[in-house]
Amino acid sequence: MWKKVLIAIVFITSFSFAAEVKIRDEVYVEGFRPNYLTGYGIVVGLNGTGDGTTSRYTLISIANMLRKLGIYIDPAQVRTKNAAAVMVTANLPPFAKPGMAIDVQVASIGDAKDIVNGLLIRTPLYGPDGKIYAFAQGPVSTGGGFLESNKGGKVQKGFPTAGIIPNGAIVEEELPFDFNSMTEVTLSLKNPSFSKAQEIVNVINQKYPGLAVVQDPTSIKVRLPQTKNKTEFLAEILDLKIKTDKDNIPTIVFYEKTGTVIMSGDVAIDTPVYVSHGSIYVTVEKTPVISQPPPLSGGQTVVTEGVTTKVQEEKGRIISIESAKLSDLVKALNDLGVSPYDLIAILQAIKAAGKLHAEIKVM
């Protein structure tokens, strides 16, 4: 019997009352952005699942790597079943200093079956200007792998040809950035809103009058005072608190490699909705509910709207939910054994129809 793989779902409960958040949670500081780093490397230590001999760049790369270590070998004599050529990427955060550790992502570019439990050999990471800004090395965590049956078979889970190395790169060079010469900074809102931008400006100007002004729903200009340490000033305004409420857009995050779905538990679906995806049919619709008072009670008949969600598989199994909450729909789909990829495709279809008011991020 195969082991059943369920979708890992995390529901984060949202509250409708106002709460306070720091300005830094609502904005980006323009210019203070991460920079993409890219490199080419070799993952070794694979269990016979590496690149084949047709991937000549892997053969040549291994021969060149050994040559640097004083070992000279003809690339034609190299066997690559325990090694794989990979692309290595990372985000270099603003103000990163030499010696700082950053996360890296690793992905196979050859015909390797997987890079599970592999070790990335020291790889230089280059910036857009061609300079080396970091070196990456370490064991690769794929978050996938295989599930085995009691008959010796196995089924793939996740994406074993890509993975991450937490804190896997050491910064060697910092980005040139002269913050002290700046006279103003721009705060860019993560979720553009005139009201949110004005609220942020009001909070800043309450502490430092006249320094902040709204430019548009996305950006706020803040003048840097000449009589105060600029780093200290920016840290202070980013730590100021503003109120946030239920009007914030809910977010659904889907991690492809692990099949994990993270969402707000109170996201509602507008009705009616009808979705057909492969062998799965989803309906979310309103039905009238009549409340009839007893005879001679003096009460009045009241008609309200109930919501019914049905999830049906081609085989004939139907699950009904008396709710239009996204969390209930996802649980019903999970009960049917729907894969994470079918799940996110259904949610994207509902959003495209304008019935799901949430941001969907696939990572």
Swiss-Prot record:
Keyword Signal: yes
Entry's localization field: Periplasm; Bacterial flagellum basal body
GO annotation, cellular component aspect: bacterial-type flagellum basal body, distal rod, P ring; outer membrane-bounded periplasmic space
Signal peptide boundaries: 1-18
Transmembrane annotation, as ranges: none
The keyword Protease appears for this protein: no
GO molecular function, one term: structural molecule activity
Keyword tags: Bacterial flagellum, Periplasm, Signal
Top-level taxonomic group: Bacteria
One GO biological process term: bacterial-type flagellum-dependent cell motility
Function: Assembles around the rod to form the L-ring and probably protects the motor/basal body from shearing forces during rotation.
PANTHER family xref list: FLAGELLAR P-RING PERIPLASMIC PROTEIN FLGI, FLAGELLAR P-RING PROTEIN
Family under the similarity heading: Belongs to the FlgI family.
Quaternary structure, from the entry: The basal body constitutes a major portion of the flagellar organelle and consists of four rings (L,P,S, and M) mounted on a central rod.
Protein name: Flagellar P-ring protein
Source species: Sulfurihydrogenibium sp. (strain YO3AOP1)
